[in-house]
């Protein structure tokens, strides 16, 4: 398909999804420096919150270095052209968090639910629309629902007032054909004026290919992160996506070289470990497991002596979804006891 002249909005995840591998401990200075670099490179929309969204600070998800208010309050006044978004998961974030974000100047709110639970987003989507915000319905773990099932969920979010719907590959499990099937079905079912977005992860090295497939099928908002900084093997690497789009004639408004410099000079130096497709991140994609489970599984491996890969495969078998981080330790204990029993029996 010839995509020359197609215009998309790239949405940066470095300062939100990138909080997962940083254990939510980015400093205000790191946030500000990276956000300014992204702004200068031409990124139009930048997400800033705890990795698990507004209100994510907790024992279950991890305590950040600063509050959402502090991060948003530091970044928003510095932006010259970029708008700032925030993620909100009903059950973690509340309407009060949403109100706070709006008062601080957040432009876009993305209300995220599991891909079969759009009904829990109604209150938050309706309130965001009442505030006049750019309101996005964000259907996570999209591989766990059929194209037809996603259509029904997307239409619910649209009926609540969402002006954009995202098909979200939280596990990095989808392939270009399965992305096209889902995006194409949802695009055909929504109102023409409702935008469609895609959020990819790079666990099977498909982030860029899947994003291009999504654009071919009608998505106009695409998520990515500088140097791929994000959960699992990271998000779609922004600098690669921008280069590929430029070669294909897809218009992003982002400077090809400036975004490379942000990735190389600002983001890579703050990584606590390389964002790459190691065997555990690959297992996330292969088994269809929620991306932010990775570090929890690695910690459980050290504590219980059960390989992270085995924990992740079992989590996939059980069909665990985002928000069930507490079950990772339980799964590790169960597997450790089973190994111990096998050892005794032997």
Swiss-Prot record:
Question: One matching Pfam family, short form?
Answer: HMGL-like
Mind telling me which residues the site (Transition state stabilizer) is annotated on? 16
Spell out the catalytic residues: 20
Q: Which residues cross the membrane?
A: none
User: What is a GO molecular function of this protein?
Assistant: manganese ion binding
Family, similarity comment = Belongs to the 4-hydroxy-2-oxovalerate aldolase family.
The name this protein carries in UniProt is 4-hydroxy-2-oxovalerate aldolase 3
The encoding gene is nahM
């Amino acid at each position: 398909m010839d995509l020359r002249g197609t215009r998309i909005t790239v949405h940066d995840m470095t300062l939100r999804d990138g909080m997962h591998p940083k254990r939510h401990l980015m400093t205000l200075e790191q946030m500000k420096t990276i956000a300014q670099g992204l702004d200068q490179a031409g990124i139009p929309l930048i997400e800033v919150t705890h990795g698990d969204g507004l209100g994510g600070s907790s024992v279950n998800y991890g305590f950040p270095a600063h509050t959402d208010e502090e991060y948003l309050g530091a970044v928003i006044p510095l932006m010259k052209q970029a708008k700032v978004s925030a993620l909100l998961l009903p059950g973690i974030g509340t309407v009060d968090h949403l109100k706070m974000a709006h008062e601080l100047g957040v432009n876009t709110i993305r209300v995220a639910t599991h891909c079969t639970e759009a009904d829990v987003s109604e209150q938050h989507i309706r309130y965001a629309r009442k505030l006049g915000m750019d309101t996005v319905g964000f259907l996570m773990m999209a591989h766990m629902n059929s194209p037809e099932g996603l259509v029904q969920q997307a239409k619910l979010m649209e009926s609540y007032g969402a002006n954009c719907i995202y098909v979200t590959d939280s596990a990095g499990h989808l392939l270009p054909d399965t992305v096209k099937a889902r995006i194409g079905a949802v695009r055909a079912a929504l109102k023409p004026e409702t935008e469609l977005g895609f959020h990819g992860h790079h666990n099977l090295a498909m982030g860029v290919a899947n994003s291009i497939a999504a654009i071919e099928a009608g998505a106009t908002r695409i998520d990515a992160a500088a140097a791929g900084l994000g959960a699992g093997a990271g998000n779609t690497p922004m600098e690669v996506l921008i280069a590929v789009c430029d070669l294909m004639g897809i218009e992003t408004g982002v400077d090809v070289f400036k975004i490379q410099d942000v990735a190389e000079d600002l983001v890579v130096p703050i990584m606590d470990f390389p964002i790459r497709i190691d065997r555990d991140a690959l297992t996330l994609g292969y088994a269809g497991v929620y991306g932010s489970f990775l570090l929890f599984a690695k910690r459980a491996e050290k504590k219980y002596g059960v390989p992270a890969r085995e924990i992740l495969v079992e989590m996939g078998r059980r069909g665990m979804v985002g928000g069930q981080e507490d079950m990772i330790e339980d799964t590790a204990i169960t597997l450790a006891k089973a190994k111990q029993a096998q050892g005794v029996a032997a």
